[in-house]
Curated annotation (Swiss-Prot):
The lineage of its organism: Bacteria, Bacillati, Actinomycetota, Actinomycetes, Mycobacteriales. This is Holliday junction branch migration complex subunit RuvA. Residues 140-144 are annotated as: Flexible linker. The gene is ruvA. Residues 64-140 are annotated as: Domain II. Residues 145-202 are annotated as: Domain III.
Length: 202
């Protein structure tokens, strides 16, 4: 079992990163928020979960153990696979997701692409007592100029399956709610807000 990968970032795609460690390139699937913090040529360490199936072995990477543990916990729920688990962590960071589950916030959970009302109710039913609300701080993610943030968020949304026009409109709506001159725009925050907005308008 591969619990973490520490090495040089050699490629970044919309849904994964390739990290070279000890001469081996590892493809690690990750959320858009995590990917937005990475840069080619830099050293990075990701906490990982490995999903082994008959025809594949897939790595999923996270910035901390809390997110990784929530990912594996989500996989224990009937009907939840890696794709939905990753989409959930793309919309909500670990503390926020824990809080939503602890509060039984079905409406918040249905904002995740792929989770309907019944699926959200199942998540609450099976995880409410298992997941404690917001145990600690969150990992600080990348920040940048508004134009850079916009392009990264739009690309991430398209990678999650949304149409380009939808992605652009949602991103612009979220950015318009903030100070347009803010050079400390949070990629992670804008992405989550855009996903929540798209979830409301599905």
């Amino acid at each position: 079992m591969i619990a973490s990968v520490n090495g040089e970032v050699i490629d970044i795609a919309l849904d994964h990163v390739v990290i070279e460690a000890a001469g081996v390139g590892y493809r690690v699937n990750a959320t858009p928020a995590t990917l937005s913090t990475l840069r080619r040529g830099t050293q990075i360490r990701l906490i990982t979960a490995m999903i082994v199936r008959e025809d594949s072995m897939t790595l999923y990477g996270f910035t901390d153990t809390d997110a990784r543990d929530l990912f594996t916990t989500l996989l224990g729920v009937s009907g939840v696979g890696p794709k939905i688990a990753m989409a959930t962590l793309a919309v909500y960071d670990a503390p926020t997701l824990r809080q939503a589950l602890a509060d039984g916030d079905v409406a918040a959970l249905t904002r995740v692409p792929g989770i309907g009302k019944r699926g959200a109710e199942r998540l609450v039913l099976e995880l409410r007592e298992k997941v404690a609300a917001a145990p600690g701080g969150t990992t600080e993610l990348g920040r940048g100029t508004a134009s850079l943030v916009r392009s990264q968020v739009v690309e991430a949304l398209i990678g999650l399956g949304f149409a380009a026009k939808q992605a652009e409109q949602a991103t612009d709506t979220v950015l318009a709610q903030d100070n347009p001159g803010d050079t400390g725009a949070d990629v992670s925050g804008v992405l989550r807000s855009a996903l929540a907005l798209l979830g409301k308008t599905r």
